[in-house]
């Protein structure tokens, strides 16, 4: 057995801060224009009707309405306007 702790011990112990990614709004929920729907890295969810995509792939609402998600070959997020 080693009688010293080893040189790596004091250099370990770091962890990055979580980025709080994922869905921020569920299907069927009412949203207003500009609301963030999804925070993501890459395009796990794709924008559809009345949904925009930011430069960091964040999806946001372009109109007031109800969130709808549809899964085909990809998962699409839409906002259906409410009268």
Swiss-Prot record:
SUPFAM superfamilies reported in the protein's UniProt record: Ribosomal L27 protein-like
A family per Pfam: Ribosomal_L27
A single GO molecular function term of this UniProt record: structural constituent of ribosome
Keyword Lipoprotein found: no
Lipid metabolism found in the keyword field: no
Region of interest: Disordered: 1-25
Disulfide bonds listed in the record: none
Protein family: Belongs to the bacterial ribosomal protein bL27 family.
Database matches in NCBIfam families: L27
Protein name: Large ribosomal subunit protein bL27
Lineage of the species this protein comes from: Bacteria, Pseudomonadati, Chlamydiota, Chlamydiia, Chlamydiales
């Amino acid at each position: 057995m080693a009688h010293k702790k080893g040189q790596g011990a004091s250099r370990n112990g770091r962890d990055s801060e979580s980025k709080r990614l994922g869905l921020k709004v569920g299907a069927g929920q009412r949203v207003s224009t500009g609301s963030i729907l999804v925070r993501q890295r890459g395009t796990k969810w794709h924008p559809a009707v009345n949904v925009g995509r930011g430069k960091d792939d964040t999806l946001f609402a372009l109109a007031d309405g109800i969130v709808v998600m549809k899964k085909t070959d990809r998962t699409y997020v839409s906002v259906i306007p409410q009268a």
